[in-house]
């Protein structure tokens, strides 16, 4: 067998394999002889079919079969000998074997990039730190009170904070548009759940008195046919309700499964939950910052095949989020634009390649104690922690998920050792609600 390797553009390689005709003909003849011993053809007894008859009828199909299997065996051998690791499935051609000629084929594919990890070498990395304040707990209590308001009907004009039940119909250029109408729709005025101007336009309205309001859809609105356009909504208020905040007493605490200690126990429970979620978010953000820093000093050529594969995964994820279920094998995924996923796919591929090399270089292995500690941390948030522990330990797949998270933490810790760390204080809202929060000054 002869093998040649040609370097094409970037990571692309072209491997040419030539198998001697003697080996090909020997394999084809062997299979035809075996076939002759068991094939059934009208007019001949089983096993008594003349070889030339078998050859004339089955030679082409046997050659195709030999070609496919020879590609599998010889290409694997060629890749091993030349230390080539394909990043995607090779494109092979041709697969035909001509009698009396060497079987020659080419395989074109991208190889996995070979690179050495560059360390940070005390490069500065800014991480964040945060804690739950008394004010944060009080704000959460107020949100819970808002969510548990007692609503009663009123007859006064609508004011901010009221809940209304409305019928509405939207128009573009005096024509109704799809998805622009509803009946019996509940809306808290000031909640910001509708497009800008819609809720403000209802303030001052009264029951059964028609309203016409003009609003403009945001330029970045999800439906392109509505984005940036002015619409008119005809609204009828069917009901107006005023909310009353519940008192901060034991009855309120009991709504959140607090049996003893009243509001103080509720605050303690809320603080613990907030602190747990804050710690998780801060750790995640700091991990990302450390990974981004390592990627910034490690420029890796990315195989297009891996990017394409990751884009397909992201498309599947989006389909799942949009439609709430996995698509069936015969169900066509909508043709989402590639540019929606390309940057994220490139980042994932870059990080995945770098992560694997970093783990190999530093011989990082998931620590069993850390795996068990992470499971204990997850379990502590549940009413029946032992059940959750048993759930993880009952499946290799479940344990592998935890091990992967532990590996991420261990890699991040190792990267941090080689960096010059600075810390920035951020308040709770800045971390948990980045679009709403504000940064605190300080180191």
Curated annotation (Swiss-Prot):
Belongs to the FKBP-type PPIase family. Tig subfamily. It catalyses: [protein]-peptidylproline (omega=180) = [protein]-peptidylproline (omega=0). SUPFAM superfamilies: FKBP-like, Triger factor/SurA peptide-binding domain-like, Trigger factor ribosome-binding domain. Involved in protein export. Acts as a chaperone by maintaining the newly synthesized protein in an open conformation. Functions as a peptidyl-prolyl cis-trans isomerase. This is Trigger factor. Residues 161-246 form the PPIase FKBP-type domain. Consists of 3 domains; the N-terminus binds the ribosome, the middle domain has PPIase activity, while the C-terminus has intrinsic chaperone activity on its own. GO terms for biological process: 'de novo' cotranslational protein folding; cell division; chaperone-mediated protein folding; protein transport; protein unfolding.
């Amino acid at each position: 067998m002869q093998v040649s390797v040609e370097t094409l553009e970037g990571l692309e390689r072209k491997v040419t394999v030539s198998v001697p005709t003697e080996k090909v003909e020997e394999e084809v003849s062997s299979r035809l002889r075996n076939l002759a011993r068991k094939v059934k053809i009208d007019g001949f007894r089983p096993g008594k079919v003349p070889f030339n008859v078998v050859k004339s009828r089955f030679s082409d199909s046997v050659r195709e079969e030999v070609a496919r299997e020879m590609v599998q065996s010889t290409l694997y051998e060629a890749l091993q000998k030349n230390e080539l690791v394909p990043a995607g499935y090779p494109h092979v051609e041709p697969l035909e074997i001509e009698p009396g000629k060497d079987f020659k084929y080419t395989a074109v594919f991208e190889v996995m990039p070979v690179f050495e990890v560059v360390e940070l070498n005390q490069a500065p990395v800014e991480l964040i730190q945060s804690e739950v304040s008394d004010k944060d707990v009080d704000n959460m209590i107020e949100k819970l009170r808002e969510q548990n308001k007692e609503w009663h009907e009123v007859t006064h004009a609508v004011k901010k904070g009221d809940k209304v039940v409305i019928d509405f119909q939207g128009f573009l250029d005096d024509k109704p548009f799809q998805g622009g109408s509803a009946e019996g729709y509940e809306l808290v005025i000031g909640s910001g759940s509708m497009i800008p101007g819609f809720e403000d336009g209802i303030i001052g309205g009264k029951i059964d008195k028609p309203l016409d309001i003009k609003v403009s859809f945001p330029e970045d609105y999800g439906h392109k046919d509505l984005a940036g356009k002015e619409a008119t909504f005809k609204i009828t208020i069917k009901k107006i309700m005023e909310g009353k905040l519940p008192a901060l007493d034991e009855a309120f605490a009991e709504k959140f499964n607090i049996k003893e200690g009243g509001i103080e126990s509720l605050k303690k429970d809320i603080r613990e939950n907030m602190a747990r979620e804050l710690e998780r978010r801060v750790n995640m953000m700091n991990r990302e910052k450390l990974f981004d820093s390592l990627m910034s000093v490690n420029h890796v050529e990315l195989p297009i095949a891996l990017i394409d594969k990751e884009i397909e995964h992201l498309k599947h994820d989006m389909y799942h989020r949009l439609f709430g279920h996995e698509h069936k094998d015969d169900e066509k995924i909508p043709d989402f634009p590639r540019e929606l996923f390309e940057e994220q796919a490139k980042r994932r591929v870059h990080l995945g390649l770098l992560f694997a090399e970093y783990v190999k270089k530093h011989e990082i292995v998931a620590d069993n104690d850390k795996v068990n500690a992470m499971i204990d941390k997850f379990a502590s948030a549940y009413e029946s922690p032992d059940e959750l522990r048993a759930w993880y330990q009952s499946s290799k797949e479940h344990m592998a998920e935890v091990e992967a998270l532990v590996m991420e933490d261990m890699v991040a810790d190792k990267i941090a050792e080689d960096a010059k760390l600075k810390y920035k204080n951020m308040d709770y809202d800045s971390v948990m609600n980045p679009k709403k929060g504000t940064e605190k000054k300080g180191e």
